[in-house]
A protein has these predicted regions:
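N-terminal accessory targeting/assembly segments
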Residues: 1-114
Length: 117
């Protein structure tokens, strides 16, 4: 996120509530609201929210391929600059998602580090 007087980054928020995840790792409406507040703290504007319920995370894209496509459509339609995931992503998942979504991708931990940088 940029904290200078440059263009405010528009963020798409995404999360996964997988049955195979520990309860504290699952995204919920409450955790996505907290994520939106973190984005605002970092100087961004949350404009899109997507929550997927799925048995297990996709090892390649974390969300299912259909949800990744839906998120991409929402990112384009809402002129988003950034996608922020409520869950921890692996470096390879972040790389694949950046390629698929066409925007910078952060997870919750990366966003928090960005706030305190």
């Amino acid at each position: 996120m940029q904290s200078t007087k440059q263009k405010i980054e528009r963020a798409a928020l995404a999360g996964l509530a997988a049955a195979s995840m520990d309860e504290r790792e699952r995204s919920t409406d409450i955790s996505l609201a907290e994520l939106a507040a973190l984005v605002e703290t970092a100087g961004g504007q949350p404009v899109v929210t997507l929550l997927q319920n799925k048995p297990t995370p996709d090892p390649r894209t974390f969300l299912g391929e259909g949800k990744v496509a839906e998120l991409h459509e929402r990112i384009v339609a809402n002129d988003c600059d950034l996608a922020v995931f409520d869950n921890e992503l692996s470096p390879s998942q972040m790389r694949v998602l950046e390629e698929e979504l066409g925007v910078r991708v952060l997870d919750r931990s990366g966003l928090i580090l960005d706030i305190f940088a």
